[in-house]
Amino acid sequence: MSLKKTDRIIDELADRLFIVEGEVTDLLTSETMQNLNANMQTTTGAIAVGSALVGQIGSAALASFAASDEGIEVSDFAIEITDQNNQKHYFKGCFPVVIFKKGDMVKVIAEPLSGQNKYAYASAIIDQKNNYIWTSQEVVKGRIQHRITSMKFGLIIGCFSILVFCLFAFFDDNWISFIFSQPVLASFFICLFISLFIGWRIGASFDEQSIELEAILKKLGFNKPNQMNLQNFALSDLSWKNKEKDFIHERWKDYTYRIDLAKQYDEEKYGKK
């Protein structure tokens, strides 16, 4: 997919996205359903706990939460937001972790679902008090960042292959002249070029996730969404960089990002001077 075509898709998605701010007044997650079932409650009984959401999300969709065996890696959730005008909004989504809870003031970046007017898909949720943002699985890097990361990895593999070749060539009496001969040097450059190209293509395979992230960041007013890597602003990464002595690694910190620091970085590096 060409970059221009991808840019157009991102613009269209950003236009479809809308933002709702308010209080979390109801919440149902995969973990909630699984815990209720573990306590010998039926699925129907478990859904009754989230009855405020049943009429909007639908019992069939909520029942799938309890049937899912992926709750360890990701968590489906349904959420009710009540805005300042006391109007209720309903969303359904799936994040690696669900840390927000009832009573939190949040900002939801959502996409309308085709043929569905009762609820929308939550692309990202921001905790307004702590400036935390959560997104779907792998929705953390823009297109350029994904490509750069993959190309670096490809370059490492290419250099390792060349090093192994040189180690074997070392056993030849004329290994220096052999390695620096034009055919061998040309082969090295071709190997590195192919490694970079493969890395570029691997990075491009994440375009679907990158498109979603870039649309979200564009909606939030970022200057260069395609250059952004939210992983640099994950709580765990920030604690490691700041060398916090009392830091304890917890999984939720790997998937919770500081949107305020990301915005500050974007403004300082790519904002108008």
Each predicted region: which residue ranges?
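Short, contiguous, well-structured surface segments enriched in hydrophobic/aromatic residues
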Residues: D69-F77
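Short, basic/aromatic beta-hairpin or loop at an interaction surface
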Residues: D76-Q87
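Short beta-strand segments
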Residues: V20, Q87-K92
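Alpha-helical transmembrane spans
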Residues: K141-M228
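Charged, low-complexity cytosol-facing tails and large interhelical loops of integral membrane proteins
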Residues: L217-K273
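Structural detector for short beta-strands of small beta-barrel domains
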Residues: L3-E70, M105-K107, G142-I144
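OB-fold/S1-family single-stranded nucleic acid-binding modules
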Residues: E111-G154
